[in-house]
């Protein structure tokens, strides 16, 4: 697929067709026009303007300082750089938790900047907010498992959903978000078997990061996948620059690995 790049921007319907056909969806985080153009040329299906920009672009220890204005700025830059990839924008900490009205207002800002969908963290507690947003024309991706905006509540960056009770809570969260109208779920740092169950039971697109190979697709943090800067990374990260002739080649290899199911491998996966 990397050799065939369409000129029309992908839509939710296009991603649904990939999902229904059993084709894995390849998503990268990206924050600027140059990398967006490179990823688009490699055939990426979706770009996430993640609040991870707080870590990899702004140099913060957490994602918490990122603002709506930050995400909107980078979303607009990404949109200008690519013609094909489906664009998802993160809702940063403090931009949606107060009320559904606050969430809609800030999501509308991100949609105006070029997002086709927004992503927010939280489970059943956020279902009323998701329902409010979807009913007013905002497509929503839920984010459950390890939710970095709740790092202080979680006590650090730890694998979630371990143990029967924790796994059931995560399943309940997934079903609540689906019922509220979320058409995509990002599953982060949970056991692969649990991610497979959630994917099967919800019937919506699931995008994994540290959640095993049975999700509908994978999201890769650009800087991690390209080893920028070199150093220790999370277990689920693969350095696609190893053996690559260029960053474009690394991007093509990463997308192909998601599509053919070779990434993530067992070495990138958490067990229950």
From Swiss-Prot:
This is 3-methyl-2-oxobutanoate hydroxymethyltransferase. Its main location: cytoplasm. It is found in: Cytoplasm. GO terms for molecular function: 3-methyl-2-oxobutanoate hydroxymethyltransferase activity; magnesium ion binding. Its EC number is 2.1.2.11. Binds 1 Mg(2+) ion per subunit. Mg(2+) binds at residues 51, 90, 121. The gene is panB. The keyword Transport does not apply. It comes from the Bacteria. It catalyses: 3-methyl-2-oxobutanoate + (6R)-5,10-methylene-5,6,7,8-tetrahydrofolate + H2O = 2-dehydropantoate + (6S)-5,6,7,8-tetrahydrofolate. 3-methyl-2-oxobutanoate binds at residues 51-52, 90, 119. InterPro entries: Pantoate_hydroxy_MeTrfase, Pyrv/PenolPyrv_kinase-like_dom, Pyrv_kinase-like_dom_sf. Catalyzes the reversible reaction in which hydroxymethyl group from 5,10-methylenetetrahydrofolate is transferred onto alpha-ketoisovalerate to form ketopantoate. It is an enzyme of class 2 (transferase).
């Amino acid at each position: 697929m990397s050799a065939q790049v369409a000129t029309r921007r992908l839509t939710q319907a296009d991603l649904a067709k990939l999902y229904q056909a059993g084709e894995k969806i390849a998503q990268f985080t990206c924050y600027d026009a140059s990398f967006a153009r490179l990823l688009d040329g490699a055939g990426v299906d979706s770009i996430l303007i993640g609040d991870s920009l707080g870590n990899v672009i702004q140099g913060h220890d957490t994602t918490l300082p990122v603002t709506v204005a930050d995400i909107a700025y980078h979303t607009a830059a990404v949109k200008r750089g690519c013609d094909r990839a489906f664009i998802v924008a993160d809702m940063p900490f403090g931009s949606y938790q107060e009320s559904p009205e606050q969430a809609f207002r800030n999501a509308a800002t991100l949609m105006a900047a070029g997002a086709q969908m927004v992503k927010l963290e939280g489970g059943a507690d956020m279902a009323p907010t998701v329902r409010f947003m979807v009913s007013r024309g905002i497509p929503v991706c839920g984010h459950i498992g390890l939710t970095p905006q709740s790092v202080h509540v979680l006590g650090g960056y730890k694998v979630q959903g371990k143990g029967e009770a924790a796994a059931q809570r995560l399943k309940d969260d997934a079903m609540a978000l689906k019922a509220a109208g979320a058409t995509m779920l990002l599953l982060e740092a949970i056991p692969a078997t649990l991610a497979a169950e959630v994917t099967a039971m919800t019937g919506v697109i699931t995008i994994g990061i540290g959640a095993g190979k049975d999700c509908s697709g994978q999201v890769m943090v650009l800087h991690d996948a390209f080893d920028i800067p070199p150093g220790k990374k999370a277990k689920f990260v693969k350095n696609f620059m190893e053996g690559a002739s260029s960053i474009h080649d690394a991007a093509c290899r990463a997308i192909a690995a998601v599509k053919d199911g070779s990434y993530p491998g067992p070495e990138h996966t958490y067990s229950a």
